[in-house]
Regions:
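C-terminal hydrophobic structural anchor segments
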Residues: 404, 408-465, 470-473
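Gly/Gly-Pro- and Ser/Thr-rich, intrinsically disordered tail segments characteristic of DNA damage-repair
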Residues: 1-285, 289-292, 443, 449-507
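A glycine-rich phosphate-binding loop feature that marks nucleotide/adenosyl-phosphate handling sites
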Residues: 184-187, 282-283, 341-353, 415-427, ...
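Short aromatic/hydrophobic contact patches that present stacked aromatics
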Residues: 145, 387, 420
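DNA-contacting surface of Y-family translesion DNA polymerases
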Residues: 8, 229, 235-416, 436
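Short, charged/polar surface micro-motifs in flexible loops or helix N-caps
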Residues: 12-14, 38-40, 352-356, 426-429
Length: 507
């Protein structure tokens, strides 16, 4: 088997860098956060600039965390200011470094997702000048994975040379710098980029390039903490592993070597994670058999379509029901647009912390309590599934099903903050027709009354389908808000506002 070489390239603080360039600022020096300040300070920041990260602010902080961290940094800074007083403020890290009498200020840039997508498309066209599309996997809006094997041999260059060539071309074209990881498999390339590159000194353009092979990975990464820094290891995995005394990738690798009679062995991991333990063990050793060709060829056996939203403020039962119906309606249109159908709806309702912080509400609640990622106590979320009698993309049928499901699983007395709605068991319309063609009929379904009822139902579905397709045509031509339903204009409805967003952020 041919040894392969992969590159992982991540555009540095992409959203923040785009906003800096739009203001004719060097992306490395301004103190800037991309966030919708028109919402509450609980809003999630889409990105923070490298200079702002230097104050201990993570990339996906909430706006109030930025405010708090900057306030703390200014208190420390004031102790060293001449006369213990600030003479002004600046959002430039260069000015702040040269003048201790300035307070830390910061710019807030509202998100512009459509604009960022245009920039991402431009940058992808730069990649295509160096690499064929078959050798690129777009991992996210600001990250790609590249199989560089054939290019290194053909052009007689190193992987670092190719990575630098691509990154400098992006820098010249857009002004945005990047970080790269190099490895013999996709996993090691990504870990080199995500973790190891952070310890590499940047060059004069702010570029960091790091390289890992299996042995170097084991030497450098086996003791690295936290585990959540590693690809595909989330808080849940970390918590389970730490509960049995495994804190590092080295611990996981050693665990996998244990004999059946040992306290720790691979069965310990399989008991915790099922078949996913195999991937975890492979990654602990720095192995990854999947190639970009495999990714390109992959077709999922089953699929789902869904959406979620965080409400801008806590919603009561009645207003939440309206939003759930809006989500079901939008889900139906998404299915129609993709020529898909479903026969299963899955709904998750996440409750607000006010249910436990408000004394009156807290006394009235006697259910299970969970702790969220911020360490706050909240009522346990509600979760349920509704199976439909047949495959459908009907807005009427999906709204009726999700309304019934919501009323069945949601606590009428609790305030809601998060909603997730998913259509499961999704098939193409043609595949569903074939499956339903062999549906077993019973004696009652053959009666004249039953057949007439079914024929009338089919007519209604055909009429509704024509309305849905007409709505989609209008939305495509004139915008998502060009045609709305009455419920979208009711108090508390969110669809109209969400139509102007991409990924929950302003377009």
């Amino acid at each position: 088997m041919t040894e392969r070489t992969y590159l992982a390239i991540d555009l540095k603080s992409f959203y923040a860098s785009v906003e800096c360039m739009e203001r004719s600022l060097d992306p490395m020096t301004p103190i800037l956060v991309v966030a919708d300040a028109s919402r509450t300070e609980k809003t999630i920041c889409l990105a923070v600039s490298p200079s702002l990260k230097a104050y201990g602010i993570p990339g996906r902080a909430r706006l109030f965390e930025v405010v708090q961290k900057v306030k703390e940094a200014n208190l420390k800074r004031q102790r060293n200011a001449p006369g213990y007083r600030f003479t002004g403020a600046s959002s430039s890290s260069v000015e702040l470094e040269n003048n201790p009498g300035l307070a830390i200020g910061y710019l807030i840039a509202p998100p512009r997702m459509a604009h960022y997508m245009e920039h991402s498309t431009r940058i992808y066209s730069v990649y295509l000048k160096h690499v064929a599309p078959d050798d690129i996997h777009v991992y996210s809006i600001d990250e790609v994975l590249i199989d560089a094997t054939s290019y290194l041999k053909r052009e007689n260059i190193t992987a670092k040379d190719l990575a630098m060539r691509i990154i400098l071309d992006v820098l010249r074209t857009t002004g945005i710098t990047a970080t790269a990881g190099i490895g013999p498999n996709l996993y090691l390339a990504k870990i080199a980029m995500d973790i190891y590159a952070k310890h590499v000194q940047p060059d004069e353009n702010g570029v960091r390039i790091a390289e890992l092979d299996e042995m170097k990975y084991r030497q450098l990464m086996w003791t690295h903490r936290p585990l959540t820094d590693f690809w595909r290891v989330g808080k849940g995995y970390e918590k389970k592993l730490e509960s049995i005394g495994l804190y590092t990738m080295g611990d996981i690798a050693r665990c996998s070597l244990g004999a059946p009679t040992d306290l720790y062995n691979e069965d310990t991991l399989y008991d915790l994670f099922g078949v996913n333990a195999e991937l975890l063990i492979d990654h602990a050793w720095g192995w990854e058999p999947c190639t970009i060709a495999d990714i390109k060829a992959y077709k999922p056996e089953a699929s789902s379509v869904g959406s979620g939203q965080v409400l801008e403020c806590p919603y009561d039962f009645v207003r939440t029901r309206l939003v759930v119906r809006e989500m079901a309606d939008q889900l139906a249109l998404s299915l129609v647009e993709s020529r898909l159908v479903t026969r299963q709806i899955v709904l998750t309702v996440g409750y607000d912390i006010e249910n436990l912080t408000d004394k009156t509400r807290s006394k009235a609640y006697h259910g299970e309590v969970k702790v969220d990622r911020y360490g706050r106590k909240i009522p346990k979320h509600a979760h349920g599934t509704a199976n439909l009698p047949r495959y459908t993309s009907s807005s009427v049928q999906l709204m009726d099903a999700v309304t019934e499901l919501f009323e069945r699983i949601a606590d009428k007395n609790l305030l809601v903050r998060r909603l997730n709605l998913t259509a499961g068991n999704v098939l193409t319309e043609s595949a569903a027709q074939k499956e339903e063609a062999v549906e077993q009929l019973d004696l009652f379904s053959l009666s004249p009354t039953s057949q007439e009822k079914r024929a009338e139902e089919e007519k209604k579905l055909v009429r509704e389908r024509k309305r849905q397709e007409a709505m989609l045509a209008i939305k495509r031509k004139y915008g998502k808000n060009a045609i709305l339903k009455g419920m979208n204009l009711q108090e508390g409805a969110t669809a109209k506002d969400r139509n102007g967003k991409i990924g929950g952020h302003k377009a």
